[in-house]
Amino acid sequence: MNLVLMGLPGAGKGTQAAKIIEDYAIPHISTGDMFRAAIKDQTPLGQEAKSYMDKGELVPDEVTIGIVRERLAKEDCANGFLLDGFPRTVKQADALEVLLADLNKQIDHVVHIGVNPEKLVPRLTGRRICPTCGATYHVIYNPPKVEGVCDIDGSALVQREDDQEETVRRRLEVNVAQAQPLIDFYAEKGYLRNLDGDRPINEVYSDVQALLGGQ
């Protein structure tokens, strides 16, 4: 079973991915993990990706796609995979189709977890970090015992600049604009499966299970 998982930041992709890989025994493959592994293994493509990342530049599509190809060719993907964070563009999606055909594979489902962006703002702005130990909290979903204070070491919690409302809203706008052409692409291909993410985690996952069945 070969899956692509799509959704805005904060839509709950990570939570659903964790359940899918446990229940269906397929590897969770994220772009970040692929880059880190290729760099750690010092593969030629990994070293090329690192040269761009060290300069703060975006890794070109051809390098990213090469790393994806290497990862999907590994033995643990023989019975399927869950791609998360790739593809991000129609160009990447086209390239993914080609490389999967080369590997005698094809996408079974593109699972899109749809969430109202306005509902994501409090999720994404509520995160607080301990600058000392790195512990993560959320003012609504995972608050510390004492407001604004780390449970572990008593440090004052901080909000990352990335989590401030103006930045979050801007990031969501960009993500919505980038995602729509990809959603349209997979809808035309017949792969797209839209799930309502504005519900409790277990309700969303029940829909995932109904979709995937005993595959």
Swiss-Prot record:
Organism expressing this protein natively: Exiguobacterium sibiricum (strain DSM 17290 / CCUG 55495 / CIP 109462 / JCM 13490 / 255-15)
Reactions catalysed according to its record: AMP + ATP = 2 ADP
Entries under InterPro entries matching the protein: Adenyl_kin_sub (IPR006259), Adenylat/UMP-CMP_kin (IPR000850), Adenylat_kinase_CS (IPR033690), Adenylate_kinase_lid-dom (IPR007862), P-loop_NTPase (IPR027417)
Pathway recorded for this protein: Purine metabolism; AMP biosynthesis via salvage pathway; AMP from ADP: step 1/1
Family classification: Belongs to the adenylate kinase family.
Protein known as: Adenylate kinase
Record: residues binding AMP: 31, 36, 57-59, 85-88, 92, 160, 171
Protein EC: 2.7.4.3
UniProt lineage: Bacteria, Bacillati, Bacillota, Bacilli, Bacillales
GO CC, any one term: cytoplasm
Annotated binding of Zn(2+), by residue: 130, 133, 150, 153
Location of region: LID: 126-163
Annotated spans, NMP: 30-59
GO molecular function: adenylate kinase activity; ATP binding; zinc ion binding
Compartments (UniProt record): Cytoplasm
Complex formation: Monomer.
Domain notes: Consists of three domains, a large central CORE domain and two small peripheral domains, NMPbind and LID, which undergo movements during catalysis. The LID domain closes over the site of phosphoryl transfer upon ATP binding. Assembling and dissambling the active center during each catalytic cycle provides an effective means to prevent ATP hydrolysis. Some bacteria have evolved a zinc-coordinating structure that stabilizes the LID domain.
